[in-house]
Amino acid sequence: VIEPIRVASDNGGQLQLQRLGAAPTSGPVVLLLHGAMSDSRVFLPAEHGLARYLAEQGCCVYVADLRGHGDSQPALGGPQPIRMSDLLQADIPALLEWLRSEHPDQRLFVVSHGWGGVWLAAALIRKPQLLASICGLVQLGVRRRALAGGRFTRFARRCIWGALASIAGRFKGRIPACSMGLGSHDESVDVHTVCLAWERGEWRDLEDGFDYASALKSLAWPPSLYLAGDRDRVLGHMQDVRRFAHELGRHDAQVILLEKGRGCSRHYGHTDLLTHPQAEQDHFPLIADWLAQRQQPTHTQELFPRCSAADVEGAAYIT
């Protein structure tokens, strides 16, 4: 059973949450957060998906849509523009604060996909008081910088994701991700512009100049699990995912490559690591086990040291 919930956010936001599973007494409370050019459907494909799987394992699961996505308001293309600052400073904090009030005695896990993991990290860096309620993070195909890959990969990122999408956005007033085959949901021009700037350069806010990388240095980051598909060459390359884990500093982290023949029955890309039915046998159990282990108060942290870019390039994958 899926229960729809509305959560109020600043600047006129009305966010859709979908709850699966009964309110738990001991199981993990899990928020699922989509990324750019996507929405909550990535966690809820027909008759399967990560949201349903985790609910069946005893988790209380909340699937979110940020403004401009799904049925949340304001909608994309309406009179009110969708800006990155709304997502980071209004929507994500509103969701976390609502969950904290709904489950005051339980700690929260957040599972993010793609750019959703970077948005979540930025929101937490801006409002570090929210970190106290978070028990752990699962990052699926999440990276900030886009440096890895060969010539074709770099061409696809710069020309299709970058230049062509930006030109189309200027004409249409939105990034037509669906018609361009870039995603399952059209995207805000401002959100896309900020993502492009972040993947090519410094992690700095384009509106007020807030330096996320500098502010991050004083924070203790939550335990995190990072997964990347071996066929994800453009949006979540393993080397870029690992680089993002290092960027977040010294913390309890596992970085895992989902690779055919090494624990997985098939190759996985950026989206089908969530939507393919076989994921329920390949790596969804890994996610559920990680959540259960990190919820235990006796869990011992394994620190993931900060390394240079050269160290990241030559590092062995943790599998």
Predicted regions and their residues:
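Short, surface-exposed "cap/lid" segments of acyl-processing enzymes
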Residues: 23-70, 74-75
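Short beta-strand/loop motif that positions the catalytic acidic residue
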Residues: 226-228
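Conserved alpha/beta-hydrolase "acid-adjacent" motif
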Residues: 233-239
